[in-house]
Amino acid sequence: MSVKNGLVQLENLTSMEKLSVDEVMGLIKRASAFKAGTAEFDLEKQTFASNLFFENSTRTHHSFHIAERKLGLDVLEFDAQASSISKGETLYDTVLTLDALGVDICVIRSGVEHYYEELVNSDNIHCAIVNGGDGSGQHPSQCLLDLMTIYEEFGKFEGLKIAISGDLTHSRVAKSNMMMLQKLGARLYFTGPAAWYSEEFDDYGHYANLDRILPELDVHMLLRVQHERHDSGESFSKEGYHNHFGLTEERAKMLKPTAIIMHPAPVNRGVEIADSLVESPQSRIVQQMSNGVYTRMAILEAILAGKKAK
């Protein structure tokens, strides 16, 4: 990984831990250039990408597809049910096969944490691996689009007060964001049910009472309650969660006029956030979705630059 002539070069993108501040800022600025229509990109040869999603996805899956098409890549959509995965083939052997067929980039989402380690450490797999989310582990492309959205608003990260609220333990978005936001100089707070907070977060910020810190925040980043990752009986009722931990209309009145509301989506309206606030003037949720395309264009460009530099 490196930055040369203003362009980031990546071999793979699996975790935010692997990225430097310079690389992150380079990707944000490149994504902004794609958004503004000022970025020049020339695909020098036919390039194939395949999107392997073993968990349901709307935003990540389709924004990667659109990003790939905007850059001129040939996209091989992958249906696990129609593939040899349904016959018992492993993810490793599936990627080994796609690599042998000539696929250059595999974007993968899996419920298995760290699935990518076996792939990137293989001597026989040469395609680039982009992690589209691994269980409760990491979600680097979501983190980067979140950072782009924050940077568009404030032009900095240093000194910003940011709360990440909700289902912390089960959230790969929280883990990716806390790592990089701390590195970029933001001051982090965590709020939500104490049962969904763990000691690993102590290295990055402070567990706080939401009502006490709301007036100080620059960014309130909400997280979806991930019922599919919970043990039975672990979840709250929708109304109970919203009243105790969600961004209600009354709580939103406590925010500074300059503060912004974020959510990686899908949004459970009336649970993490009041329905009326999802598209409110302070919300940047739709902007996050839009920025996902440009951020993923920047990621793919960096991967292609890394492959060319080898």
UniProtKB/Swiss-Prot annotation:
Tell me which residues bind L-aspartate: 87, 172, 224
| Swiss-Prot/TrEMBL catalytic activity | carbamoyl phosphate + L-aspartate = N-carbamoyl-L-aspartate + phosphate + H(+)
SUPFAM superfamilies linked: Aspartate/ornithine carbamoyltransferase
Q: So, what pathway does this thing act in?
A: Pyrimidine metabolism; UMP biosynthesis via de novo pathway; (S)-dihydroorotate from bicarbonate: step 2/3
**Record-linked Pfam families:** OTCace, OTCace_N
- Gene Ontology MF term list: amino acid binding; aspartate carbamoyltransferase activity
Q: Which InterPro entries does the UniProt record give? A: Asp/Orn_carbamoyltranf_P-bd, Asp/Orn_carbamoylTrfase, Asp/Orn_carbamoylTrfase_sf, Asp_carbamoyltransf, Asp_carbamoyltransf_Asp/Orn-bd
Listed under GO cellular component are: cytosol
* Any GO BP: 'de novo' pyrimidine nucleobase biosynthetic process
Annotated carbamoyl phosphate binding lies at 59-60, 109, 139, 142, 265-266
Return the EC number: 2.1.3.2
Q: What class of enzyme is it?
A: transferase
Q: Which keywords are on file for this protein?
A: Pyrimidine biosynthesis, Transferase
Q: What does this protein do?
A: Catalyzes the condensation of carbamoyl phosphate and aspartate to form carbamoyl aspartate and inorganic phosphate, the committed step in the de novo pyrimidine nucleotide biosynthesis pathway.
Q: Which family does it belong to?
A: Belongs to the aspartate/ornithine carbamoyltransferase superfamily. ATCase family.
Subunit structure, per the record?
Heterododecamer (2C3:3R2) of six catalytic PyrB chains organized as two trimers (C3), and six regulatory PyrI chains organized as three dimers (R2).
**Database matches in NCBIfam families:** asp_carb_tr, PRK00856.1
Q: What is this protein called?
A: Aspartate carbamoyltransferase catalytic subunit
Q: Which organism is it from?
A: Lactococcus lactis subsp. lactis (strain IL1403)
Organism ancestry: Bacteria, Bacillati, Bacillota, Bacilli, Lactobacillales
User: Which gene is this protein's source?
Assistant: pyrB
